[in-house]
């Protein structure tokens, strides 16, 4: 790329990107954010690696580990934002390293501009994993979780996992159609135990990861069945901002203790988290404004919300509009959950609740906490990284692994507080009470962990 063109690009990007505060969800409506394929990432990632290694002798160059990224249009080119792990080789050269160093993992953020197959590195921010993480947990970070981990299992590892797998099958009442499928699931289970260990090593909170009812599912199966990719791909209906309130929040709050939250539900093998998040919010709003707690129908939204995509995902903003346009929600007892799409059977005469509007909340977590304490449970969306293996405790995933750019699961904020001086959000999930802490997930509060503050919303009941 010519020097003049480089300068023009830099001036453009500095005026539009670098000098602007980075929002929690950075893409405008006409832009896209997604998990790019390895093929799309290959060229910009290799270029960033070459720039990182520039001037290094053979044998001292880092190698590329895991990569994830997003892209947006930039004039006639593309701007790639990459998050990558680099593996640094051991260093025994006293002229380079005063003390011998073992192999280490480095976390990097790059911005690469691509135009006419030419690349320009605009930003590089790298630091060793242990510099940021070992203060939270004593662990060996050579086992850092590759996001594209396809390494072969250690020899005989599946055999060693067989007793645990047998216990898993008994605990969760698993049966398989053939011996071959059982063997395959054992292999998946064994690989998942390695993944859970790596997630555990990099969690900065008190969360424990391990065997759950999802431990025999591949990562792809889990994402396809239980998560909601539309949350990161579509913008949905615009909502008005919530009216300002007193931003002073009490030290802790829990709507479960105040009767505003129904029992934990189970979405089953259906990506309908969006419906459960919204009905949970409406249940709380109706209770606070009418004094009655009713368990409301998610199935009505699967069947009758024609904008969202039922088990293939949906957006809370669209669901609120559907409830308002339909004329309300029936109860769970009257319109029971089936876990798949059926013909819409809604009857306005059977509706027990209605909403007047919906609002979008601030991305400031202190304001979210104040709104929750004063107004009720809140529909939010998060990046579900690690939740496949979450058992209990306060999750605080390493940010590059639980990026707010890749939210894929809608849930319900019901409270907040502190455990052992660690601030948390109490989150009602929709995977049944046999997951997590009796169906609940506890996530670190105060840093926008996993994008918890990026899509907070609520119905309005007058």
Swiss-Prot record:
Disulfide bonds join 270-311, 304-344, 402-450. One of its GO terms (molecular function) is cysteine-type peptidase activity. It is an enzyme of class 3 (hydrolase). Glycans are attached at residues 35, 138, 173, 345, 356, 418. It catalyses: The recombinant enzyme cleaves synthetic substrates with Phe and Leu (better than Val) in P2, with high specificity constant (kcat/Km) comparable to that of cathepsin L. This is Cathepsin F. Keywords: Disulfide bond, Glycoprotein, Hydrolase, Lysosome, Protease, Signal, Thiol protease, Zymogen. PANTHER family: CYSTEINE PROTEASE FAMILY C1-RELATED. Belongs to the peptidase C1 family. Its EC number is 3.4.22.41. It is found in: Lysosome. The gene is Ctsf. The active site is at 273, 409, 429. GO terms for biological process: proteolysis. Pfam families: Inhibitor_I29 (PF08246), Peptidase_C1 (PF00112). It comes from the Eukaryota. It comes from Mus musculus. InterPro entries: Papain-like_cys_pep_sf (IPR038765), Pept_cys_AS (IPR000169), Pept_his_AS (IPR025660), Peptidase_C1A (IPR013128), Peptidase_C1A_C (IPR000668), Peptidase_C1A_papain-like (IPR039417), Prot_inhib_I29 (IPR013201). CDD domains: Peptidase_C1A.
């Amino acid at each position: 790329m010519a020097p003049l063109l480089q300068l023009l690009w830099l001036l453009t990007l500095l005026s539009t990107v670098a000098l602007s505060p980075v929002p929690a969800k950075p893409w405008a409506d006409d832009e896209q954010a997604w998990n790019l394929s390895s093929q799309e990432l290959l060229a910009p990632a290799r270029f960033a690696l070459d720039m990182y290694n520039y001037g290094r002798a053979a044998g001292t160059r880092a190698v590329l580990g895991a990569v994830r990224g997003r892209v947006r249009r930039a004039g006639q080119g593309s701007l790639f934002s990459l998050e990558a792990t680099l593996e640094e080789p051991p260093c025994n050269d006293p002229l380079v390293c005063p003390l011998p160093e073992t192999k280490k993992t480095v976390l990097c953020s790059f911005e690469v501009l691509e135009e006419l197959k030419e690349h320009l590195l605009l930003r590089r921010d790298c630091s060793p994993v242990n510099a940021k993480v070992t203060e939270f947990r004593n662990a060996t970070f050579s086992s850092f979780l590759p996001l594209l981990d396809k390494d072969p299992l250690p020899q005989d590892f599946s055999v060693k996992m067989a007793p645990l797998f047998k216990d898993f099958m008994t605990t969760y009442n698993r049966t398989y159609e053939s011996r071959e499928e059982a063997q395959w699931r054992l292999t998946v289970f064994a690989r998942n135990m390695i993944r859970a260990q790596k997630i555990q090593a990099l969690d900065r909170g008190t969360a424990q990861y391990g065997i759950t009812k999802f431990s025999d599912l591949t990562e792809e199966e889990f994402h396809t069945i239980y998560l909601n990719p539309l949350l990161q791909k579509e913008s949905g209906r615009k909502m008005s901002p919530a009216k300002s309130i007193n931003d002073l929040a009490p030290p802790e709050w829990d709507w479960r203790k105040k009767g505003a939250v129904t029992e934990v539900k189970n979405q089953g093998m259906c990506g309908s988290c969006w419906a459960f998040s919204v009905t949970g919010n409406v249940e709380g709003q109706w209770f606070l404004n009418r004094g009655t707690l009713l368990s409301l129908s998610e199935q009505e939204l699967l069947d009758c919300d024609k904008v969202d995509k039922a088990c293939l995902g949906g957006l809370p903003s669209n669901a609120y509009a559907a409830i308002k346009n339909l004329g309300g929600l029936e109860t769970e007892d009257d319109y029971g959950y089936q876990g798949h799409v059926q013909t819409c059977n809604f009857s306005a005469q059977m509706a027990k609740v209605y909403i007047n509007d919906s609002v979008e909340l601030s991305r400031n977590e202190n304001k979210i906490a104040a709104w929750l304490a004063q107004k009720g449970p809140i529909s939010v969306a998060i990046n579900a990284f690690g939740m496949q293996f979450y058992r209990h405790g306060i999750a605080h995933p390493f940010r590059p692994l639980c990026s707010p750019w890749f939210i894929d699961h809608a849930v319900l904020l019901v409270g907040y507080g502190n455990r052992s001086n660690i601030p948390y959000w109490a989150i009602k999930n929709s995977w049944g009470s046999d997951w997590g802490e009796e169906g609940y997930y506890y996530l670190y509060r105060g840093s926008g962990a996993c994008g918890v503050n990026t899509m907070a919303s609520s119905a309005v009941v007058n």
